[in-house]
């Protein structure tokens, strides 16, 4: 099932830098992580859904690029974010 508007709003509230912040790398990575986790559950039941798998790979790539950007500009913020999200590295 897709990430709902309420779930997105909760993620934004949890990871925003300031009130009204929806575009910071932290928020974008957190939203992508929520969608990636949702799709990972989808693939447990729909193993042959290769079309959606391509979308998943695009999301993972976009998240990786955003994390690389964040690591270059704010290492402390990067480390905090991957720890909070439970990502490896």
Swiss-Prot record:
Keywords: Ribonucleoprotein, Ribosomal protein, RNA-binding, rRNA-binding. InterPro entries: Ribosomal_uS15 (IPR000589), Ribosomal_uS15_bac-type (IPR005290), uS15_NS1_RNA-bd_sf (IPR009068). It comes from the Bacteria. GO terms for molecular function: rRNA binding; structural constituent of ribosome. Belongs to the universal ribosomal protein uS15 family. PANTHER family: RIBOSOMAL PROTEIN S15, BACTERIAL AND ORGANELLAR, SMALL RIBOSOMAL SUBUNIT PROTEIN US15M. One of the primary rRNA binding proteins, it binds directly to 16S rRNA where it helps nucleate assembly of the platform of the 30S subunit by binding and bridging several RNA helices of the 16S rRNA. Part of the 30S ribosomal subunit. Forms a bridge to the 50S subunit in the 70S ribosome, contacting the 23S rRNA. This is Small ribosomal subunit protein uS15. It comes from Nitrosospira multiformis (strain ATCC 25196 / NCIMB 11849 / C 71).
